[in-house]
Amino acid sequence: MWNRRQGRLRTLAFGVEELRRRRREREAALRKARREQQLVSKRLLREDAPEEVGGQSAAVLLGEAEVQQFLRLAQRGTDEKEREKALVSLRRGLQHPDTQQTFIRLEGSMRTLVGILTSNRALLQLEAARCLHELSHSEQSAVAEACLPATSYLLTYLSGHSSDFIELCLYTLGNLIVESEAVRKQLLPQGIVPAFAACIQSPHVAVLEALGYALSQLLQAKEAPEKIIPSILDSSLPQQMLWLMQPGPKLNLGVAMEFAWCLHYIICSQVNNAVLLTHGALPTLALLLLDLAGTVQRMDDVGLELLACPVLRCLSNLLTEVPAEVMGQQMELRDERLVAALFIFLQFFLQKQPALLPEGLWLLNNLTANSPTFCTSLLSLDLIEPLLQLLPLSNAVCMLVLTVLCNVVEKGPAYCQRLWPGPLLSCVLNTLALSDTEVVGQSLELLQLLFLHQPEAARAFLQQSGLQALEKLQEETQLQERIHALQQIAATHG
């Protein structure tokens, strides 16, 4: 009798371990798929007053002769006012794609513009920089590459005294970085990383936002993991970014959002996330999430989801690289308030941005995967029922909810007893009727784990026409193994 029981226990233990191994393999593939990058974009700073534009579109198509004339006046006008006026006219013309092409084809045009940019006339410098900014917004890589002679000067001016000028240079660099690998290749030896590291010390919010934008564009380059991110990790930038994301009265949502995306791209590269962990990325992000959840409760709609999304992604991806024992040493990551904060955001997303629900659920999955503490928090805070209410929303949401529930159930009989009796079984039975094979497969896995640890659930499954539900799935060949396993367990315990 003892030997038979030992053998049966070994078989069940192997079954649980095999289920866990399979799910971890699937989750590894999911994690890889979720290391998605935000689409690159360009930003345009235009401060034309209505009276300057005359109530009409500022973009003016200029011919070659007109471009030459404005360049000549900008370079050799009778006085500074005439030169500035010529640059303003040129800038408006450069808002038109055809004028941009005319400009870069014109011999000596960029040399003339760079000459004005490097002059000692502040107003002319500013207008020349605005002309470059218009060019940087082009979608043609040839236009961006035509701006190569100006990049070293734009970098130099990042150490200047005018915050407005620095902001303009940063957005221009960010736009150029997106469009051309040649630009990025030139900027690296010119010292873009040290220049950015100096910029992050700025007290000006607009400069910091512009820096976050430019840095995020640099981090999304295809060559970033090999050629860019290592030097960024060796600089003071990661530590300073995390400092700017610390919750408190000085936290600026716009700045924090830009640098949260920067951290996301660094983490997704998997170059050396140990550096971020050493600088306290996990506790900083966890505390920020707690702070944001409190703000969501106090204020209705302040655009917090724009910051919450990258913060959730950063935490989710970092947790996959942290051993469970190390995670347990982080006080902020042992706090059940983190689970409560996640559910505040899930409720917020449900009402305001349903598309962001998977972000919160993915973090909840990674928190509960290897942590009995967080599974206990889900149970002690009575959050299983709110979780079950998310099942009907979409297949993606349903899949993640089922995965989180598997994390709880696989922790053993003590956890399953706290789930039973309750609405779990009936909710999961409903998912067996869904058309998504992956979701149904995850439901079968959850039921198998539940029956192994809670035999009463298997008996209730039979009483609620569970076998009939399984028979309807017989044509799904890829589910046959799980269906047979579940039928055997149900029959054994029923």
Swiss-Prot record:
Q: Does the record carry Endoplasmic reticulum as a key word?
A: no
Bilayer topology term: Multi-pass membrane protein
Q: What is its main location?
A: membrane
- GO MF terms held by the record: nuclear import signal receptor activity
Q: Which InterPro entries match?
A: ARM-like (IPR011989), ARM-type_fold (IPR016024), Armadillo (IPR000225), Importin-a_IBB (IPR002652)
Sorted keywords for this record are:
Coiled coil, Membrane, Transmembrane, Transmembrane helix
Entry protein name: Transmembrane and coiled-coil domain-containing protein 6
Report the coiled-coil segments: 15-39
Disulfide bond annotation, renumbered to this chain: none
GO terms for biological process, alphabetical? protein import into nucleus
Compartment list: Membrane
Example GO CC term: the record gives: membrane
What parts of the sequence cross the membrane? 338-358, 386-406
Its domain of life reads Eukaryota
